[in-house]
């Protein structure tokens, strides 16, 4: 059967922003630069970001992903993923005589620092997040004696604190904004003196991607979210789409996972992607839809993003030293080829 022609009634609403956030971009580039700088293999503790395509691409270039620090042979380089790690992991790396590169997203590092500061002031810290997620494990490890995990409003009833006047909430950076505030409201009902973090812990990229989906959800009968099933922020986009009024929303890693029956009775399809997703995967989804008559694409713009994070300091240091060495070999700064 040949490709369908575009129908005036069929269209795609394409979310903007979508895909890579600054923290993911930094982490992926860090692995690529480390492979260039040190050669393969470069070990990465946990998936650098939660995206199957990205991980497979980096594996082909020589990255080796491990779940435990002890899996890295002594004397090698290990990079910590964008989700962050607990202090005990740094200690494990030191015992294993491993050189470390910390690719933790700076916005996650901010939450870690808040946890340490409030723990030092002897606050009970209520961490809103999903049990077992790597980011939550890392943040909890910063102050294990002070942090309690609150996995949604239904967890609030069982929360106990030592002093109701010294309680603060923090959150995983990739949650649904609405769901988090529902949990915060429930916590405030129980602990009226609950303190909020100095600034919102849910990252700008998570909020912007959810806002774009909210704007398209009322018009799109179907929303396709490109992202992996272990990606918290991608799964939240599916939930947000349904809450915004979309009849159906699905998470796919690749275009070939889309079921044609999803298009039955659909004239408007919303398309977005999680913060760990390269745009090439979205382009493949758009091509798939175009071949089925959904050729008209409208951008739904919720925000501008211009944030860029610098590479991990360990990598910047070694790149600077290499550049200085090359200059010295060529007879001094700025004189080569003069």
Swiss-Prot record:
It catalyses: isopentenyl diphosphate + 2 oxidized [2Fe-2S]-[ferredoxin] + H2O = (2E)-4-hydroxy-3-methylbut-2-enyl diphosphate + 2 reduced [2Fe-2S]-[ferredoxin] + 2 H(+); dimethylallyl diphosphate + 2 oxidized [2Fe-2S]-[ferredoxin] + H2O = (2E)-4-hydroxy-3-methylbut-2-enyl diphosphate + 2 reduced [2Fe-2S]-[ferredoxin] + 2 H(+). GO terms for cellular component: cytosol. Its EC number is 1.17.7.4. It comes from the Bacteria. GO terms for molecular function: 4 iron, 4 sulfur cluster binding; 4-hydroxy-3-methylbut-2-enyl diphosphate reductase activity; metal ion binding. Isopentenyl diphosphate binds at residues 50, 83, 133, 231-233, 276. Its cofactor is [4Fe-4S] cluster. (2E)-4-hydroxy-3-methylbut-2-enyl diphosphate binds at residues 50, 83, 133, 173, 231-233, 276. The keyword Lipid metabolism does not apply. [4Fe-4S] cluster binds at residues 21, 105, 203. Binds 1 [4Fe-4S] cluster per subunit. Dimethylallyl diphosphate binds at residues 50, 83, 133, 231-233, 276. Signal peptide: none annotated. The active site is at 135 (proton donor). Pathway: Isoprenoid biosynthesis; dimethylallyl diphosphate biosynthesis; dimethylallyl diphosphate from (2E)-4-hydroxy-3-methylbutenyl diphosphate: step 1/1; Isoprenoid biosynthesis; isopentenyl diphosphate biosynthesis via DXP pathway; isopentenyl diphosphate from 1-deoxy-D-xylulose 5-phosphate: step 6/6. HAMAP family: IspH. NCBIfam families: ispH_lytB, PRK01045.1-2, PRK01045.1-3, PRK01045.1-4. This is 4-hydroxy-3-methylbut-2-enyl diphosphate reductase.
């Amino acid at each position: 059967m040949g490709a369908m022609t575009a129908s005036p009634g069929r269209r795609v609403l394409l979310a903007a922003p979508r895909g890579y956030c600054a923290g993911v971009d930094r982490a992926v580039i860090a692995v690529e630069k480390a492979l260039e700088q040190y050669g393969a293999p470069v070990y990465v503790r946990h998936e650098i970001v939660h995206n199957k395509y990205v991980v497979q691409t980096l594996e082909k270039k020589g990255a080796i992903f491990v779940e435990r620090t002890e899996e890295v042979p002594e004397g090698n380089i290990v990079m910590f993923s964008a989700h962050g790690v607990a202090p005990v992991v740094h200690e494990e790396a030191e015992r294993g005589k491993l050189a470390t590169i910390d690719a933790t997203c700076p916005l996650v590092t901010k939450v870690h620092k808040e946890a340490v500061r409030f723990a030092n002031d002897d606050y009970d810290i209520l961490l809103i997040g999903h049990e077992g997620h790597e980011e939550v494990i890392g943040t909890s490890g910063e102050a294990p004696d002070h942090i309690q995990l609150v996995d949604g409003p239904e967890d609030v009833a069982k929360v106990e604190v030592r002093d109701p006047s010294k309680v603060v909430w923090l959150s995983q950076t990739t949650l649904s904004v609405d769901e988090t505030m529902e949990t915060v409201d429930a916590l405030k009902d129980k602990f009226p003196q609950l303190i909020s973090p100095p600034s919102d812990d849910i990252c700008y990229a998570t909020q912007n991607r959810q806002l774009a989906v909210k704007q398209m959800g009322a018009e799109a009968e179907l929303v396709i979210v490109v992202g992996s099933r272990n990606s918290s922020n991608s799964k939240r986009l599916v939930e947000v789409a349904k809450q915004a009024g979309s009849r159906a929303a699905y998470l796919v890693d690749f275009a070939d996972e889309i079921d044609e029956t999803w298009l039955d009775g659909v004239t408007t399809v919303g398309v977005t992607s999680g913060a760990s997703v390269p745009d090439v995967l979205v382009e493949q989804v758009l091509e798939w839809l175009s071949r089925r008559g959904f050729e008209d694409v409208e951008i739904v713009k919720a925000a501008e993003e211009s944030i860029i994070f610098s590479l991990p300091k360990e990598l910047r240091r070694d790149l600077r030293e290499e550049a200085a060495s090359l200059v010295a070999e060529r007879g001094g700064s700025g004189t080569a080829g003069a």
